[in-house]
Amino acid sequence: MARPTKKTGTKKQKKNVPNGIAHIQSTFNNTIVTIADTKGDVVSWASAGSSGFKGAKKGTPFAAQTAADAAARRAIDQGMRQIEVMVSGPGAGRETAIRALQGAGLEITLIRDVTPIPHNGCRPPKRRRV
């Protein structure tokens, strides 16, 4: 019988980053929370889809809260204490994601809205008729 091969992959080492930047990208269909250190290297991330939501439920505020909570817990395990929050997009999960980051135990020092606003750029999609 053949012997099982040993794993030779690199194990992810625990960083010790006390402060960082949280990017919340909230669209109508999903919310993505990425927490990086001050250099820009990603420490943890989570999305509504990776938190177990599918379809239209990914765009809900509760899904954004769950995603932000998961990302914050992983960042706290890496030693993060303080974050600056950059919010982008028009989605429903913007405020709830910020509250979830705060509720998870991270101290928020700054909240900035970095949503790109066109100077009359592309034509927007047509109105929905339901």
Curated annotation (Swiss-Prot):
Cellular component annotations (GO), alphabetically ordered: ribonucleoprotein complex; ribosome
Record keyword Lipid metabolism present: no
Keyword terms of this UniProt record: Ribonucleoprotein, Ribosomal protein, RNA-binding, rRNA-binding
Biological-process GO terms, alphabetical: translation
Family annotation (PROSITE patterns): RIBOSOMAL_S11 (PS00054)
Any Pfam family the entry gives: Ribosomal_S11
Superkingdom as given in the UniProt entry: Bacteria
Quaternary assembly: Part of the 30S ribosomal subunit. Interacts with proteins S7 and S18. Binds to IF-3.
Family: Belongs to the universal ribosomal protein uS11 family.
Function: Located on the platform of the 30S subunit, it bridges several disparate RNA helices of the 16S rRNA. Forms part of the Shine-Dalgarno cleft in the 70S ribosome.
Name of the molecule in the record: Small ribosomal subunit protein uS11
Gene: rpsK
